[in-house]
Each structure stands twice: as C-alpha cells, then as structure tokens.
C-alpha cells in the first residue's frame, strides 16, 4: 500500500451551521495539495478532522488506509501540523521549544536535527531568545522547525506563510 491520505464523504456541522459538506479527495505520497477558499469555508475544520482533533459529523479520514478516529495514537506520531492559532510557550527559548518537541517525539539525533533546522530556517542566532520576544514571522519559523523536528511523513499546514518574509 502506498502512503496516502484519503478524505471520504467528510462533513462537519456545528449546531445549524454546515462547516464542511461531503468532501472527498486523496493525497498520495510526495504530493503537495492546497485547500483554497474564502475565510470561513471550512479549511481549518477539514485539517482538524484530518488530524483527528475534530470528530466529523459524517465520513472518515484514512491515513495509509487506517481510520484516524480509530488509530489516533499510532498515526499522530507520524504526523505534524502548523497553525497560526497555536501559541508557542512564551517563556521558553527557541532551543528549549525544539528540545521539548523533540523529546515528545523521541527524536534520537535531536541536537543534530536542531542544528540542521536552525540553519535551514535561519534560527541559529535566535536559539537562545525566548519566543515571547520574537516577531510573528520568527515565531512562525520556530513553529515550522517544531513541526519538522520528528521528520513527519504527513505535514499539514494551516496558513503556513502568514507573517513570513519572502526568503523563508
């Protein structure tokens, strides 16, 4: 079986509001797919259901053929995501943030991974700064490093370029 994400007849309602209505798509390994649409059309809700953070009203999400609702723990260790709605701990340094997330994912070569990501994302001069003192764009680069720390097989991005400069 190839690695894939399959969204099947996925819907989500909040009381009387239909946030996502019966969507279907498949993303195969090494594909990059964007969900496009106006504000409030259900993109973030769809990502939440794909991660197993929100329960669909109907339909399902399969990750490599496994239902996310029934296999959250095993599947979430292979996934990661970025969202501008999730705050970084403000009193931790950039390095401490990356160490915490690396340990959560049992990254074996953690210091090497931190060094690599800090260079790639231009964070090396910020590693000892507390995240509460960073600009929005710098925080987004830390969030990206955090999301890549475990080399996820699935990376879901919700508004990943918000506040980033063109070089990033």
Give, region by region, the residue ranges found by the protein language model.
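Conserved ABC ATPase signature
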Residues: 130-134
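Conserved catalytic motifs of ABC-family nucleotide-binding domains
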Residues: 151
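Catalytic Walker B motif of ABC-type/P-loop ATPase nucleotide-binding domains
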Residues: 155-158
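Helix N-cap at the start of a conserved alpha-helix in ABC-type nucleotide-binding domains
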Residues: 166-168
